[in-house]
């Protein structure tokens, strides 16, 4: 199934899903009514209960026991946020007019392995900008470096053509998506399509078919189409850390399929559930993972993708203004360049 066909189908599914999820109760701020509505929405539609081995009934009973009829909205919000945190899911949030409940332990409990000030030293002042990409030549102009900080920042086909043409005399490429928390999946596919000359199976996707925790459709194949523009088949290293999430995780998953690509750095943060939104009777919004996305082996990457080569920034290098991960990528690519000469 081609990507455009799949996303059209997915949009239709989303419309049906949102219609089904919309709570029919009238507006109310009653704590128990809203608590039960939130629990039920997740119970019937969240996609990772079995994978994460979460006993949602037990979670319900534990948090329900803490409810009181006189609980104010702030205490209720905190309680609901704590309940959602049991899912350990960066795509699952509760939104009110005064706060956003979020789970960030998936990256905050790990070494950063990326520092903005350090990256600015490597970019210098003479880098170029094309859409959401910053890019320059490194290592005596032998290696191209691309920094993509967020898949929420757009990249067009013309942007990518200019970038890759700029590197036409380079022998290899570094793509740095560390600290990229995700964004638009279309940009992930558009970028990744520049590294293949043929259609590739990038993975599978499922949707809920019922209210049970294991009620899913059969996995639908999702293919990445090759670009009709400039294509790069020379060696590539993609740099990762734990803050690579959602669309960035998807990009890493796709890039690791290609034979000329090596993933280097730290394990990604994951985020392989396509999120949807629903509404509670008091008007609060809830976002959660609803459709699992699988890799070509039909495995989930919700908890992250291991790099091909594990590298972390050392304290000694950081003190000297050296990015251990970039330097390791340069050394690795130089070895390939020397071997090919």
Predicted regions and their residues:
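Short beta-strand-initiation
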Residues: 11, 130-132, 273
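Juxtamembrane/interface motifs at transmembrane-helix termini
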Residues: 97-99, 308, 323
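C-terminal alpha-helix
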Residues: 328-336
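Structural motif
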Residues: 13, 138, 165, 228-231
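Conserved acidic, small-residue-rich alpha-beta core segments centered on
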Residues: 186-320, 327
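Proline-centered flexible-loop/turn and helix-kink motifs
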Residues: 8, 12, 46-47, 168, ...
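Bacterial Sec-dependent N-terminal signal peptides
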Residues: 1-28, 341
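Flexible, low-complexity junctional segments that flank or bridge functional domains
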Residues: 20-208, 213-221, 235, 277, ...
């Amino acid at each position: 199934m081609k990507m455009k066909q799949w996303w059209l189908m997915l949009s239709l599914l989303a419309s049906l899903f949102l219609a089904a999820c919309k709570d029919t109760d009238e507006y109310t701020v009653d704590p128990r009514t809203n608590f039960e509505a939130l629990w039920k929405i997740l119970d019937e539609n969240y996609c990772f209960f079995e994978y994460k081995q979460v006993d949602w009934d037990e979670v319900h009973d534990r948090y329900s026991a803490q409810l009181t009829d006189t609980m104010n909205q702030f205490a209720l919000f905190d309680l609901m946020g704590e309940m959602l945190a049991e899912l350990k899911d960066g795509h699952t949030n509760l939104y009110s007019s005064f706060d956003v409940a979020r789970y960030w332990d998936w990256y905050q409990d790990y070494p950063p392995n990326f520092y903005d000030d350090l990256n600015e030293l490597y970019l210098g002042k003479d880098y170029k900008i094309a859409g959401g990409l910053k890019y320059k030549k490194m290592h005596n102009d032998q290696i191209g470096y691309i920094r993509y900080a967020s898949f929420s920042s757009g990249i067009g086909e013309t942007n990518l053509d200019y970038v890759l043409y700029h590197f036409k005399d380079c022998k290899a490429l570094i793509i740095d998506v560390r600290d990229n928390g995700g964004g638009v999946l279309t940009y992930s596919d558009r970028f990744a399509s520049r590294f293949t000359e043929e259609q590739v199976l990038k993975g599978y996707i499922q949707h809920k078919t019922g209210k049970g925790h294991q009620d899913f459709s059969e996995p639908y194949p999702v293919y990445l189409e090759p670009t009709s523009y400039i294509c790069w088949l020379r060696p590539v290293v993609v740099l990762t850390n734990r803050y690579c999430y959602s669309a960035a995780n998807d990009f890493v998953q796709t890039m690791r399929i290609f034979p000329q690509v090596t993933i280097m750095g730290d394990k990604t943060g994951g985020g392989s559930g396509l999120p949807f939104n629903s509404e509670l009777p008091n008007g609060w919004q809830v976002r959660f993972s609803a459709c699992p996305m699988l890799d070509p082996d039909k495995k989930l990457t919700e908890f992250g993708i291991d790099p091909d080569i594990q590298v972390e920034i050392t304290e000694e290098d950081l003190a000297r203004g050296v990015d251990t991960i970039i330097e390791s990528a340069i050394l690795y690519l130089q070895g390939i360049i020397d071997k090919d000469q």
